[in-house]
Regions:
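Short, conserved catalytic-motif segment at the N-terminal edge
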Residues: 23, 27-91, 111, 130-135, ...
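Extracellular/periplasmic catalytic domains that process cell-envelope and extracellular macromolecules
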Residues: 54, 82-83, 113, 143-149, ...
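Short, conserved phosphate/pyrophosphate- and ester-handling motifs at nucleotide-, phospho-/glycolipid
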Residues: 35, 96, 308
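Structured C-terminal helix/loop/strand segments within mature extracytoplasmic catalytic/sensor domains
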Residues: 383-428
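Short, surface-exposed loop or secondary-structure junction motifs
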Residues: 129-378
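Active-site SXXK
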Residues: 43-47, 66, 89-118, 126, ...
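Structural recognition of the beta-strand scaffold that forms the well-ordered cores
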Residues: 59-61, 71, 154-157, 213, ...
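Bacterial Sec-dependent N-terminal signal peptides
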Residues: 1-23
Length: 428
């Protein structure tokens, strides 16, 4: 009897694991209205970039109608090590959409309104001030009172006035460095509570709600999730998003048994690719190998996750499905609609005079201008990562695309745009 029970448990475990690994099924592209022959342009161009020394390697996955029509690894993940489709990448700011979805799950539970001041949950943000004058010689500054408090919508839409440490302007870098505020990536020790409560006492750089000002907003959002849910951010994500969706390779800090699959972070300069020292100075400490940290404690909501192309495609397909995948509902369709709707009005993103993108709640939303230049339909949404990774969901064509690289700095950020016509020209 014991043998029968053990056999049954084994079979259940085996088939459960097998099923979880195949939530997304690979099919012939032709069955989904995509030309296999024309899709070869993707391979041809990526291989050419590798041959020219502009790229070490990449993985890409394309879904249409919930099916995998393309999933390949090209080039090398490290020196003389071929890239594989299950290689793990530092996804940097592609973390932001995931954290934004996690926060909106709490919104659906009635835990906050988008108009709530964040000081309701983090008192240090009460009575904010805005930078007025700054003296670069001694890093002193004066401030003026903010016109209003930061609200949850500001944090989710990057309009709070909070800046970025380490990779921001010279002024934000200096003020944050002096106050030991890091950029949230590559600095695994410390905690969200320590950093965000200090951040709340520092000046904003523009008035809340008046500009799109890319900054540490999603790190703040990560701490808000911890405060509101009562759970550490990493545990909340595992329980509420990663496990339900079958995202088995997405972490802030990788388990030891998965670390060998992490690709090297290359650098590019003078048309050459190289692997630099792990620890570099970037207006503060930055470790290229931060995902391998043992017992890391800083869960950067803005840039800290590592993942595979397949895992991220699961997340993208959930959004395309209106918040559900494989029988597990993460968000309602109504909430998804809020997330991917323009939340910044006519505010420009990084001086984008062509208004190529608008911003929702954690997602960039492409406009008609992008459709006219890159073939990607208006209303498609997604985000990119500092280390040259790219993701978008295209509701019109029922597509999800993830293009993973790990290069910083790179002379060819534009490959994220160049790959778009290569994909869309293959549609029948």
């Amino acid at each position: 009897m014991r043998l029968v029970i053990l056999s049954a448990v084994f079979l259940f475990s085996y088939f459960s694991n097998l099923f979880s690994q195949n939530i997304l099924q690979s099919v012939n592209p032709e069955t989904q209205g995509i030309s296999s022959g024309r899709l070869k342009q993707v391979d041809a161009n990526i291989n050419q970039w590798i041959k020219e020394g502009q790229l070490n390697g990449a993985t890409a996955i394309i879904l249409r109608n919930g099916k995998i029509v393309y999933h390949k690894a090209l080039g090398f993940s490290s020196e003389n090590v071929p890239m594989k489709t299950d290689n793990i990448f530092r996804i940097a700011s592609m973390t932001k959409p995931i954290i934004s979805v996690a926060a909106m799950m709490l919104y659906e539970e009635g835990k906050f309104l988008l108009t709530d001041p964040i000081s309701k949950f983090i008192p240090e943000f009460k009575n904010p001030v805005v930078l007025d004058k700054y003296n670069a010689a001694d890093t002193t500054y004066t401030t003026v009172p903010a016109k209003r408090e930061i609200i949850m919508r500001d944090i989710l839409s990057q309009t709070s006035g909070i800046g970025y440490a380490q990779i921001g302007s010279a002024t934000t870098n200096a003020i944050y460095y002096k106050n030991k505020i890091n950029g949230g990536i590559g600095t695994p020790y410390s905690t969200l509570k320590d950093v965000i409560t200090k951040l709340g006492k520092l000046p904003l750089f523009v008035q809340p709600g008046e500009e799109f000002y890319y900054g540490l907003n999603t790190d703040v959002l990560g701490y808000l999730i911890e405060v509101i849910s009562g759970m550490p951010l990493d545990k909340y994500l595992q329980q509420k998003i990663f496990q339900p969706l079958g995202m088995k390779d997405t972490y802030f800090f990788l388990p030891k048994e998965k670390q060998a699959r992490l690709v090297s972070l290359y650098s590019q300069g003078n048309n050459k690719m190289s692997i630099q020292d792990s620890l570099i100075n970037l207006n503060g400490t930055f470790s290229r190998d931060f995902p391998k940290t043992i017992n890391g404690t800083y869960f950067s909501g803005g840039a800290g996750l590592s993942s595979t192309a397949y895992d991220y495609a699961l997340f993208g397909q959930m959004l395309l499905n209106g918040g559900e995948l494989n029988g597990k509902r993460i968000l309602s369709p109504a909430t998804i609609q809020i997330i991917v709707s323009n939340q910044i009005g006519e505010l420009l993103m990084w001086g984008d005079a062509n208004k190529t993108r608008r911003f929702g709640l954690g997602f960039g939303i492409l406009t008609e201008y992008a459709e006219r230049t890159l073939m990607i339909p208006a209303g498609s949404y997604g985000w990119d990562g500092m280390f040259a990774s790219h993701y978008w969901t295209d509701p019109k064509n029922k597509m999800v695309v993830v293009f993973m690289r790990n290069i910083w700095p790179t002379e060819h950020w534009d490959y994220g745009d160049r790959i778009k016509p290569l994909i869309y020209q293959a549609l029948k």
